[in-house]
Amino acid sequence: SMNNFSLILRLTFGKTRILLPGDTNRAGYGGIPPEKLAADLFKVGHHGQLDGADAALVNAVRPRFSVCCASSDRRYNSAHPDTMRLLKDSGAELYFSDCPPVDGQSIPPHRALEFTICADGAASARYLP
Protein backbone atom coordinates (compact mmCIF):
# COMPACT_ATOMS: atom_id res chain seq x y z
CA SER A 1 0.00 0.00 0.00
CA MET A 2 1.22 3.51 -0.79
CA ASN A 3 0.15 4.46 2.75
CA ASN A 4 3.13 2.51 4.07
CA PHE A 5 5.47 5.06 2.51
CA SER A 6 4.29 7.56 5.13
CA LEU A 7 6.88 9.04 7.44
CA ILE A 8 6.73 7.49 10.91
CA LEU A 9 7.93 10.22 13.25
CA ARG A 10 8.63 9.89 16.98
CA LEU A 11 9.25 13.12 18.86
CA THR A 12 10.67 13.27 22.38
CA PHE A 13 10.30 16.20 24.76
CA GLY A 14 11.82 15.50 28.15
CA LYS A 15 10.32 12.16 29.14
CA THR A 16 7.31 12.49 26.84
CA ARG A 17 7.28 10.68 23.48
CA ILE A 18 4.88 11.32 20.61
CA LEU A 19 4.39 8.86 17.74
CA LEU A 20 3.04 10.27 14.47
CA PRO A 21 2.79 7.47 11.89
CA GLY A 22 0.97 9.38 9.17
CA ASP A 23 -1.27 7.12 7.10
CA THR A 24 0.77 3.99 7.81
CA ASN A 25 -1.11 0.78 8.47
CA ARG A 26 0.27 -1.93 10.76
CA ALA A 27 2.33 -3.55 7.98
CA GLY A 28 4.31 -0.32 7.59
CA TYR A 29 5.98 -0.67 10.99
CA GLY A 30 7.95 -3.75 9.90
CA GLY A 31 11.60 -3.62 10.87
CA ILE A 32 11.16 -0.94 13.56
CA PRO A 33 12.23 -2.34 16.95
CA PRO A 34 9.26 -2.31 19.37
CA GLU A 35 11.17 -0.19 21.92
CA LYS A 36 11.43 2.57 19.28
CA LEU A 37 7.63 2.68 19.02
CA ALA A 38 6.89 3.35 22.71
CA ALA A 39 5.01 6.65 23.05
CA ASP A 40 2.84 8.56 25.48
CA LEU A 41 0.80 10.15 22.69
CA PHE A 42 -0.08 8.07 19.63
CA LYS A 43 -1.82 9.50 16.55
CA VAL A 44 -3.44 6.28 15.31
CA GLY A 45 -2.25 5.34 11.84
CA HIS A 46 -4.50 4.97 8.80
CA HIS A 47 -7.32 6.99 10.42
CA GLY A 48 -7.95 4.21 12.94
CA GLN A 49 -9.13 1.77 10.30
CA LEU A 50 -9.02 -1.91 11.17
CA ASP A 51 -5.52 -2.23 9.73
CA GLY A 52 -4.31 0.90 11.57
CA ALA A 53 -3.23 -0.98 14.71
CA ASP A 54 -3.19 -4.48 16.11
CA ALA A 55 -2.48 -5.89 19.59
CA ALA A 56 1.27 -6.23 18.95
CA LEU A 57 1.55 -2.58 17.89
CA VAL A 58 -0.57 -1.29 20.78
CA ASN A 59 1.52 -3.36 23.22
CA ALA A 60 4.72 -1.87 21.75
CA VAL A 61 3.45 1.72 21.80
CA ARG A 62 1.66 1.56 25.19
CA PRO A 63 0.06 5.00 24.71
CA ARG A 64 -1.43 7.11 27.50
CA PHE A 65 -3.32 9.16 24.90
CA SER A 66 -4.48 8.09 21.44
CA VAL A 67 -5.79 10.48 18.80
CA CYS A 68 -7.80 9.32 15.83
CA CYS A 69 -8.29 11.63 12.84
CA ALA A 70 -11.48 10.38 11.24
CA SER A 71 -14.34 11.65 9.12
CA SER A 72 -17.66 12.23 10.90
CA ASP A 73 -19.51 9.97 8.48
CA ARG A 74 -17.04 7.14 9.22
CA ARG A 75 -16.47 6.65 5.53
CA TYR A 76 -13.91 3.91 4.84
CA ASN A 77 -14.44 2.55 8.38
CA SER A 78 -12.23 5.19 9.99
CA ALA A 79 -12.07 4.95 13.80
CA HIS A 80 -13.08 1.30 13.47
CA PRO A 81 -14.78 0.08 16.67
CA ASP A 82 -12.40 -2.89 17.04
CA THR A 83 -9.34 -0.64 16.73
CA MET A 84 -10.78 1.85 19.23
CA ARG A 85 -11.67 -0.95 21.66
CA LEU A 86 -8.12 -2.31 21.43
CA LEU A 87 -6.71 1.10 22.35
CA LYS A 88 -9.24 1.71 25.10
CA ASP A 89 -8.64 -1.75 26.60
CA SER A 90 -4.92 -0.92 26.72
CA GLY A 91 -5.73 1.96 29.08
CA ALA A 92 -5.23 4.77 26.56
CA GLU A 93 -7.45 7.84 26.71
CA LEU A 94 -9.10 8.23 23.28
CA TYR A 95 -9.49 11.57 21.49
CA PHE A 96 -11.04 12.22 18.09
CA SER A 97 -10.86 14.90 15.40
CA ASP A 98 -14.63 14.62 14.98
CA CYS A 99 -17.47 14.14 17.49
CA PRO A 100 -18.69 10.53 17.40
CA PRO A 101 -20.40 8.89 20.35
CA VAL A 102 -17.96 6.34 21.77
CA ASP A 103 -19.27 3.57 24.02
CA GLY A 104 -22.34 5.68 24.78
CA GLN A 105 -20.31 8.76 25.72
CA SER A 106 -20.83 11.88 23.67
CA ILE A 107 -17.86 14.00 22.66
CA PRO A 108 -18.34 17.77 22.84
CA PRO A 109 -18.27 19.77 19.61
CA HIS A 110 -14.74 21.07 19.23
CA ARG A 111 -12.39 22.70 16.77
CA ALA A 112 -9.11 21.39 18.15
CA LEU A 113 -7.38 19.18 20.68
CA GLU A 114 -4.83 20.63 23.05
CA PHE A 115 -2.11 18.51 24.59
CA THR A 116 0.01 20.08 27.31
CA ILE A 117 3.36 18.48 28.03
CA CYS A 118 5.42 19.65 31.00
CA ALA A 119 9.18 19.33 31.37
CA ASP A 120 8.68 16.81 34.19
CA GLY A 121 6.80 14.50 31.83
CA ALA A 122 3.31 15.33 33.08
CA ALA A 123 0.81 15.56 30.24
CA SER A 124 -2.86 16.42 29.86
CA ALA A 125 -5.34 16.66 27.01
CA ARG A 126 -8.56 18.54 26.35
CA TYR A 127 -10.90 19.50 23.54
CA LEU A 128 -11.06 23.20 22.61
CA PRO A 129 -14.55 24.55 21.81
Model-predicted regions and their roles:
Residues 1-79:
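Active-site-proximal loop/helix segments of hydrolase catalytic cores
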